[in-house]
Amino acid sequence: MTLPNKAALVGLAHTLSEQVKRYLVTADETKSPEDHKLCIEGERTPSSTEHAQAWEIVRTCDRIGSLVHGPVPWLLSNALSHLDSACLAAATQLNLQDIIVDGPSPTSLDTIVTATGVSEDLLRRILRGCAQRFIFEEVAPDQYAHTDASKMLRVTGIHALVGFSCDEVMRSAAYFSNFLQQTKGKPPSWNVPSPFSLAFDPTKGLFDYYSTVDEVRGRRFDLGMGGTEATKPLVEEMFDFSSLPEGSTVVDVGGGRGHLSRRVSQKHPHLRFIVQDLPAVIHGVEDTDKVTMMEHDIRRRNPVRGADVYLLRSILHDYPDAACVEILSNIVTAMDPSKSRILLDEMIMPDLLAQDSQRFMNQIDMTVVLTLNGKERSTKEWNSLITMVDNRLETEKIWWRKGEEGSHWGVQQLRLRK
């Protein structure tokens, strides 16, 4: 094993100490729960500063780990990291989060064997794989307890999201190299073919597959995406809807069953909302006095001409650039340059060198690549995409949640130059 660079290791240890100090100061400055939006099971969403500082600590710890492991063990550990997901997938499938008691006394392996019907040997190895990642804990031989992370598996949305990640995403990842060979490394213009379609059905993209073939996985996906929504800032926390004139029309493009529009309409009753989505999505949803449901395919020209706002929340990250150009072009043709704007409510990844980026953001980006040919975009990549749509279209402003300026989530306001 190669001895680590002593000077580099000492320097990183000092960096880590300083980063932890800064992080604790930032965390202490949180005066009350009201300073943050509370999300899943009382877990608060950290401020953008706290979030960034936390990931700096994680990155420094990883750099220390790479040094002390040495290059070959570090390389192999990363190559085999999917085995952690395999153990976590088994744990969630067996519902170990419900079998293991959250209380003062641990749960015995015998109890888990009786509840699951799985052998002692396999359960030990599954739980060992999880516990090494601080998901469950063996507090005494064959005695298991919860950790903060494993408790979160009891939350429906998180359990579903983990299931999706360890099933559809992991299967799709196994086909990524096949996908690159088949497409010669050129991204398709829409969702098929994709690593997901190669893994599940070569003729169908993820959403089509869920709606026509596998409704069980589809329901789990919906629950999981609901869990992620709880961690994102609300669009009305970023964009000031009260600034729109009385009677303005907001078109919620790809707005699902209208949950967002109904929520915002209750806070801003002076506005009129039109929710557009596919017939199967909006089927059975009734109009209200402020919210109208409309059948629409984003691959067609938008039928609502001259609306004040065309809102897209978490839509474009599901598609490659060519598809996004088509989607936005179909809106641009309907815009009134004198008043219309497009609001893109999406993740905005920081423009950083690869090794300085946040691993979790990269994992989200790779998730949409593998399952949808999608893409999480940086400021530079968003600007490049917008330029491809129409040379008149430009980003006029980015709206952030108060106190979160420059964070990883914002609302980009696009207008046509007159």
Curated annotation (Swiss-Prot):
Annotated metabolic or biological route of this protein: Mycotoxin biosynthesis; aflatoxin biosynthesis
This protein's UniProt keywords: Methyltransferase, S-adenosyl-L-methionine, Transferase
Keyword Methyltransferase in record: yes
EC annotation from Swiss-Prot or TrEMBL: 2.1.1.110
Region (Substrate binding): 206-225
Propeptide stretch(es), residue numbers: 1-41
Keyword Kinase part of the UniProt annotation: no
Pfam families: Dimerisation, Methyltransf_2
InterPro entries: COMT-like (IPR016461), O_MeTrfase_dom (IPR001077), Plant_O-MeTrfase_dimerisation (IPR012967), SAM-dependent_MTases_sf (IPR029063), WH-like_DNA-bd_sf (IPR036388), WH_DNA-bd_sf (IPR036390)
Molecular-function GO term, any one: protein dimerization activity
Binding site for substrate: M170, R171, S172, A173, A174, Y175, F176
Residues the record lists as binding S-adenosyl-L-methionine: G254, G255, D277, D297, I298, R313
Record's catalysed reaction(s): sterigmatocystin + S-adenosyl-L-methionine = 8-O-methylsterigmatocystin + S-adenosyl-L-homocysteine + H(+); dihydrosterigmatocystin + S-adenosyl-L-methionine = 8-O-methyldihydrosterigmatocystin + S-adenosyl-L-homocysteine + H(+)
GO BP term, pick one: aflatoxin biosynthetic process
SUPFAM superfamilies: S-adenosyl-L-methionine-dependent methyltransferases (SSF53335), Winged helix' DNA-binding domain (SSF46785)
Catalytic-site annotation from UniProt: H317
Entries under PANTHER family matching the protein: O-METHYLTRANSFERASE ASQN-RELATED (PTHR43712:SF5), PUTATIVE (AFU_ORTHOLOGUE AFUA_4G14580)-RELATED (PTHR43712)
Function: Involved in the conversion of sterigmatocystin to O-methylsterigmatocystin (OMST) and dihydrosterigmatocystin to dihydro-o-methylsterigmatocystin in the aflatoxin biosynthesis pathway.
Family per record: Belongs to the class I-like SAM-binding methyltransferase superfamily. Cation-independent O-methyltransferase family. COMT subfamily.
Name under which the protein is recorded: Sterigmatocystin 8-O-methyltransferase
